[in-house]
Amino acid sequence: MSKVCVLTGKRPKYGNTVSHANNHRRTRFEPNLHTKRIWIEEEKRWAKVKLSAKAMRIIAKTGTGELAKLLK
């Protein structure tokens, strides 16, 4: 299963974890994804999507219209 947000396109990033002794170790930083069931009013149906926390705030502010365009 992919770890990509449907709305924002956020995906895992790679970088270094740095210890107090300044040792660098490669790591993968995962996006804050949640699987949600969202009601799309325009199509009168439920959609199960993976959304980041930022995407959930966007939907709360603007509604599901933008999400409906992406799911087509």
From Swiss-Prot:
InterPro entries: Bacterial_rp_bL28, Ribosomal_bL28, Ribosomal_bL28/bL31-like_sf, Ribosomal_bL28_bact-type, Ribosomal_bL28_sf. SUPFAM superfamilies: L28p-like. Keywords: Ribonucleoprotein, Ribosomal protein. GO terms for molecular function: structural constituent of ribosome. One of its GO terms (cellular component) is ribosome. GO terms for biological process: translation. Belongs to the bacterial ribosomal protein bL28 family. This is Large ribosomal subunit protein bL28. It comes from Chlorobium phaeovibrioides (strain DSM 265 / 1930) (Prosthecochloris vibrioformis (strain DSM 265)). The gene is rpmB.
